[in-house]
Amino acid sequence: MAKRKANHVIPGMNAAKAQGMGAGYNEKFSNEPLTEAQRQNNKKRKKNQ
């Protein structure tokens, strides 16, 4: 039998989707004002949502 890949992780898409939006980055900074560097970094996330 062929080994099957997990269907919920689609290559080419954001792999973190499998863990839900609460995993990592978003949760960490959600209640603090962003520094300038983080704000620059955040533009990419906003576009994806």
Curated annotation (Swiss-Prot):
Transmembrane segments: none annotated. It is found in: Spore core. InterPro entries: SASP_SspO. Residues 23-49 are annotated as: Disordered. The keyword Membrane does not apply. GO terms for biological process: asexual sporulation; sporulation resulting in formation of a cellular spore. Keywords: Sporulation. Induction: Expressed only in the forespore compartment of sporulating cells. GO terms for cellular component: endospore-forming forespore. Belongs to the SspO family. This is Small, acid-soluble spore protein O. The lineage of its organism: Bacteria, Bacillati, Bacillota, Bacilli, Bacillales.
